[in-house]
């Protein structure tokens, strides 16, 4: 019914599925046609991500099923990739494709490409897509694994033959099951040079050892490390070089292939087998020497039309249990398939168990059995043939769940989801660990030929957020919330009717749609492909591995050009000791009401490495310093005491890599300014960001003591130069800008960080500070060796310097208007404080810095503290989140979030936080002297049981220190003014409903007016006669609470996409959820009071 009460029919649905987008490279793409919108009078906008949704009133279920059968027949052709061109079919055209996945397998040698070969051999497998959108599987033959050892002095051809025989014998003993005719295929004498340390001779003799299979490199290395008995030389152990390089990376380096680039195989250089091994449209075999690798420039910088599948599953769990694949069915799978670079998906469907009411613009596919649902999804994967599979937490939950569920049901044909025939999906537990990211537990699902991109993993790596739920991440990046239905309600919706299952389908589709939106918004595909191109590693390495593999890849490439080899580093952890970090000049804390100019070093650490030629191959050992007698003008002694040769003797590899990266970044930024096409801009922006990150990670690679090639002599030299430059900058500024030097005021450096200094020139206006800042940067840059450069970038005015690495100020880059309020190390940007602290600090800084109203800021703090003590603060503002980096038993000191996670595990192990998750909690009232870890509690549990919060904990442990840091420089007696006084004397504590001793308490009636205990009735004797006044007050209170609850309820309905369905959302990351729950409780209590009136 519409507002006027007249029933209106909704328009019938379209009989045709959404059109498939055109297949082309994204360099010149145009969006697919959008679905037409309908008049607002006909319907509410129910599905936020769709144009609209509707229910079909006139069609019975039988006609819907008949139409569905007709539509299914056309799906395969609508979903299929474009057909191969005649030139491809006749082998008369070179095959050019963008490779996305690259791995290696062990198989029989290709007799036609490698005549005379026999037995097993390593084969490189590359999957990709042509410009036309055809899928490619390329088998590359002939590339062999190898590594190096230094040739012992005096070893000749006969000795090498004896060495070969000894090594072959030991390898045969170690690899008894290998089906190869020869384990050590060749040992050759080659002229190379180790990258470690400066050497005057141009090269030395190495032995290149080529083995039959990649796994044999490690076993051969182990034999040589332990020692080998050689005729004529006795027992000898060897230092190996490049024996820890992954086979795929070795292949890419030697063939000059980088991740995500375009590969060409010329006509006549590839062979097609009659019996194909994959489902790809183009499958062929070639020799590695026939591959042409194209640099990512011009046409070859564009992206192929990759097919991106975003999916989500819903499972019907048992009451009180989180879904488990051994017991609980998969009831819905939502799928969106988009061509990379296009705005609209060309496949939009949801597969449901049992009937589901139609959804406009969505192909609803209903099935009677779970087996049919799972096989339909398997068929979709086969027909659509996605290159990239995305979702949110798919690696840890969705994909493993589907595989295990299919195994439980005995569906043997389900796990054939990859591009290789008869190859089943494999799932194993995995743990990712790095100093930057901490420890994260996950699962590794191998789907051969398809790149899995889990958005939760990418966002974890690239962004620091207080919560990583899909709802919270979507709110942060897309300003869009979603309904979050608790797993316990999903089963009820499934067991309802077609309408409730339709609601579940809309929810499931939203969970498939948001990851696609995030992928586009954060330009993940562009950024990751460009990072792979810049660093030379496969795209899949970027999510699965840390930073060091990227630098190692660049070192190997540059080393190959220079005929250098990398030693296999043996030291770990503490063997090399530690080094002193960067300098932070003493902070002259206070509130500065005059402009503060900031002078920043451009790419400081990379610049130092380039300026002073710091590298593995330019480092001179203390012994060689004495022995080589190098002229002083050709060496540099660093402030940390290390010696490096200058470029006049030898240019370092690391400085060369850095020069190329920074030059390429300048070029990419210049091209970005000129670019007009949005897709070209996305590629160039991704490239310049990748180049910047890569340049900055080179220094970290040398300082990682557990890395591939640590060298603390380099990293300690870099930081010592950095310290020296910060101190030199301070001296030069304060010596030059003085009244004696003709300036109006004496300049003062008030703070210096790793790569920047803050200067107060004494002038009162921003423009004058900017002029002096530019002059200072130019003057000081002239005293440093190029390319070290000091730049003037910004002015802070006013500026609140709290202490080291903690400050806030208004940032100006032009004198007319400030750009933003910039903070560092303050609770506005820290993620382990509750939202109340962040909001209060932000409000205070706004009033102090922007409004220049310190008394107003103080009054706002007092009011907030009073609200906290009187229990008037939303619970959502008091939630603290901390990352769970290990299990409770592994923590040396008990922590609030660690102990809560253990308690939640005892309540419900399935929904309890795991290692790597962030745990939300609040601190509750408890016995005097109880520790914080004993008082942490789950916010939902607190709401459900009306457990009182401990306001004093929040005042003393969360609010007081951040506030005093801000107010002490601007407010006299800040502690007394803000934390003591009349506003702190009244405290209200909630009575718990059913926890602790309250389980045994007997409730006592109290007077509605004055709250004194009474035996019956509504009012005490003293309040009799005030019935009208108190009743009206009670009615008014109920009406007010109903209005508050109604507004919150409507807000939640709008978020879920329907104004005529109950709200089911229980999102822990949404402040509205906590407010709605509290309003509902308050309203129920007020109604109980009202019901006590007997008239």
Swiss-Prot record:
Cell membrane keyword on record: no
Ranges of Basic residues composition bias in the record: 1-11
Cofactor annotation comment: Binds 1 [4Fe-4S] cluster.
SMART domains reported for this sequence: POLBc (SM00486)
Keywords, ordered alphabetically: 4Fe-4S, DNA replication, DNA-binding, DNA-directed DNA polymerase, Exonuclease, Hydrolase, Iron, Iron-sulfur, Metal-binding, Nuclease, Nucleotidyltransferase, Nucleus, Transferase, Zinc, Zinc-finger
Cellular component annotations (GO), alphabetically ordered: delta DNA polymerase complex
InterPro entries according to UniProt: DNA-dir_DNA_pol_B, DNA-dir_DNA_pol_B_CS, DNA-dir_DNA_pol_B_exonuc, DNA-dir_DNA_pol_B_multi_dom, DNA/RNA_pol_sf, DNA_pol_B_thumb, DNA_pol_palm_dom_sf, DNA_pol_type-B
Zinc finger (CysA-type): 1007-1023
Annotated function: This polymerase possesses two enzymatic activities: DNA synthesis (polymerase) and an exonucleolytic activity that degrades single-stranded DNA in the 3'- to 5'-direction.
Domain notes: The CysB motif binds 1 4Fe-4S cluster and is required for the formation of polymerase complexes.
Known partners and oligomeric status: Heterodimer with subunits of 125 kDa and 50 kDa. The 125 kDa subunit contains the polymerase active site and most likely the active site for the 3'-5' exonuclease activity.
Listed NCBIfam families: pol2
Protein name: DNA polymerase delta catalytic subunit
Gene expressing this chain: POLD1
């Amino acid at each position: 019914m519409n507002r006027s009460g007249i029933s209106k029919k909704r328009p019938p649905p379209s009989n045709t599925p959404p059109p498939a987008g055109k297949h082309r490279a994204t360099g010149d793409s145009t969006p697919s046609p959008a679905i037409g919108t309908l008049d607002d009078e006909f319907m509410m906008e129910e599905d936020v991500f769709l144009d609209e949704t509707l229910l079909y009133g006139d069609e019975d279920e039988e006609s819907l099923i008949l139409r569905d059968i007709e539509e299914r027949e056309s799906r395969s052709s609508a979903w299929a990739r474009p057909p191969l061109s005649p030139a491809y079919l006749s082998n008369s055209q070179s095959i050019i494709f963008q490779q996305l996945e690259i791995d290696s397998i062990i198989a029989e040698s290709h007799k036609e490409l490698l005549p005379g070969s026999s037995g097993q051999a390593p084969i490189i497998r590359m999957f990709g897509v042509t410009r036309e959108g055809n899928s490619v599987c390329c088998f590359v033959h002939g590339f062999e694994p190898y590594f190096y050892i230094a040739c012992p002095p005096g070893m000749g051809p006969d000795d090498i033959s004896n060495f070969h025989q000894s090594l072959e014998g030991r390898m045969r003993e170690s690899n008894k099951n290998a089906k190869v005719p020869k384990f050590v295929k060749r040992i050759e004498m080659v002229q190379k040079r180790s990258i470690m340390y400066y050497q005057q001779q141009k090269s030395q003799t190495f032995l290149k050892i080529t083995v039959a299979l990649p796994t044999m490199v490690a076993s051969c290395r182990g034999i040589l490390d332990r020692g080998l008995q050689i005729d004529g030389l006795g027992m000898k152990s060897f230092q190996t070089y490049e024996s820890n390089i992954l086979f795929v990376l070795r292949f890419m380096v030697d063939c000059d292939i980088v991740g995500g680039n375009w590969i060409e195989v010329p006509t006549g250089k590839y062979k097609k087998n009659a019996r194909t091994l994959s489902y790809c449209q183009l499958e062929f075999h070639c020799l590695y020497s026939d591959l042409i690798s194209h640099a990512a420039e011009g046409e070859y910088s564009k992206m192929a039309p990759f097919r991106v599948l975003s999916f989500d599953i819903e499972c019907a769990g048992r009451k009180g249990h989180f879904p488990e694949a051994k017991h609980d069915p998969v009831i819905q799978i939502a799928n969106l398939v988009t061509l990379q670079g296009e705005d609209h998906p060309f496949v939009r469907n949801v597969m449901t168990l049992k009937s589901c009411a139609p959804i406009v613009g969505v192909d609803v596919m209903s099935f009677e059995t779970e087996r049919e649902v799972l096989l339909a999804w398997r068929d979709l994967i086969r027909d659509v043939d996605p290159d990239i599979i995305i979702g949110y937490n798919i690696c840890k939950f969705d994909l493993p769940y589907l595989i295990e569920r299919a195994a439980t049901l005995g569906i043997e044909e389900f796990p054939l989801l990859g591009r290789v025939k008869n190859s089943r999906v494999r799932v194993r537990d995995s743990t990712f660990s790095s100093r930057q990211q901490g420890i994260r537990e996950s699962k590794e699902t191998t789907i051969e030929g398809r790149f899995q991109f889990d958005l939760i993993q990418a966002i974890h790596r690239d962004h620091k957020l207080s919560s990583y739920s899909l709802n919270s991440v979507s709110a942060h990046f897309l300003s869009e919330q979603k309904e979050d239905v608790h797993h316990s309600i999903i089963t009820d919706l499934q067991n309802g009717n077609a309408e409730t299952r339709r609601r579940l389908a809309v929810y499931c589709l939203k969970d498939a749609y948001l990851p696609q939106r995030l992928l586009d918004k954060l330009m993940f595909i562009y950024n990751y492909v460009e990072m792979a191109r810049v660093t030379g590693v496969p795209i899949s390495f970027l999510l699965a591995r840390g930073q060091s593999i990227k630098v190692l890849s660049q070192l190997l490439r540059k080393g190959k050009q220079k005929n250098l080899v990398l030693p296999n580093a043996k030291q770990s952890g503490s063997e090399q000791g530690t080094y002193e970090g960067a300098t932070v000049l003493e902070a002259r804390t206070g509130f500065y009401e005059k402009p503060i100019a900031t002078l920043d070093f451009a790419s400081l650490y990379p610049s130092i490495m380039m300026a002073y030629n710091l590298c593995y191959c330019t480092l001179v050992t203390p012994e060689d310093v004495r022995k080589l007698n190098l002229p002083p003008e050709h060496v540099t002694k660093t402030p940390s005491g290390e010696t490096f040769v200058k470029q006049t003797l030898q240019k370092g590899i690391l400085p060369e890599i850095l020069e190329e990266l920074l030059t390429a970044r300048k070029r990419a930024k210049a091209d970005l300014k000129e670019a007009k096409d949005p897709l070209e801009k996305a590629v160039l922006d991704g490239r310049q960001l990748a180049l910047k990150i890569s340049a900055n990670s080179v220094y970290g690679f040398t300082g990682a003591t557990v890395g591939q090639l640590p060298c603390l002599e380099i990293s300690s030299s870099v930081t010592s130069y950095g310290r020296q430059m910060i101190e030199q900058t301070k001296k030069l500024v304060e010596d030059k800008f003085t009244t004696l030097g003709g300036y109006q005021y004496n300049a003062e450096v008030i703070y210096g960080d790793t790569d920047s200094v803050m200067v107060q020139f004494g002038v009162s206006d921003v423009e004058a500070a900017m002029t002096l800042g530019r002059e200072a940067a130019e003057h000081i840059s002239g005293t440093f060796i190029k390319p070290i450069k000091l730049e003037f970038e910004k002015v802070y005015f006013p500026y609140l310097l709290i202490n080291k690495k903690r400050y806030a100020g208004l940032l100006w880059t032009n004198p007319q208007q400030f750009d933003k309020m910039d903070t560092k190390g303050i609770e506005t940007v820290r993620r382990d404080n509750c939202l109340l602290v962040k909001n209060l600090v932000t409000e205070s800084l706004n009033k102090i810095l922007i409004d220049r109203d310190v008394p107003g800021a103080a009054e706002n703090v007092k009011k907030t503290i009073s609200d906290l003590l009187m229990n008037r603060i939303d619970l959502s503002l008091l939630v603290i989140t901390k990352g769970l980096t290990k299990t409770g038993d592994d923590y040396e000191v008990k922590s609030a979030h660690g102990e809560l996670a253990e308690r939640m595990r005892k309540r419900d192990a399935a929904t309890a936080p795991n290692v790597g998750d962030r745990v939300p909690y609040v601190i509750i009232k408890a016995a005097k002297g109880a520790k914080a870890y004993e008082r942490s509690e789950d916010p939902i549990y607190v709401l459900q049981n009306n457990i009182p919060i401990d306001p004093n904990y929040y005042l003393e442990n969360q609010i007081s220190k951040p506030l005093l840091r801000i107010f002490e420089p601007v407010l006299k007696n800040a502690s007394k003014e803000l934390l003591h006084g009349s506003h702190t004397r009244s405290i209200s504590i909630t009575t718990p409903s059913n926890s602790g001793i309250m389980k045994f308490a007997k409730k006592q009636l109290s007077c509605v007016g004055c709250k004194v205990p009474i035996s019956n009735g509504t009012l005490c004797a003293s309040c009799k006669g005030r019935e009208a006044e108190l009743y009206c007050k009670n009615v008014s209170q109920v009406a007010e609470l109903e209005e508050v609850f109604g507004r919150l309820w409507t807000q939640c309905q709008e978020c879920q996409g329907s104004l005529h369905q109950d709200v089911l959302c229980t999102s822990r990351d949404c402040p509205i959820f906590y407010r709605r729950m509290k309003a509902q409780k308050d309203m129920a209590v007020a109604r109980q009071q009202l019901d006590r009136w007997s008239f």
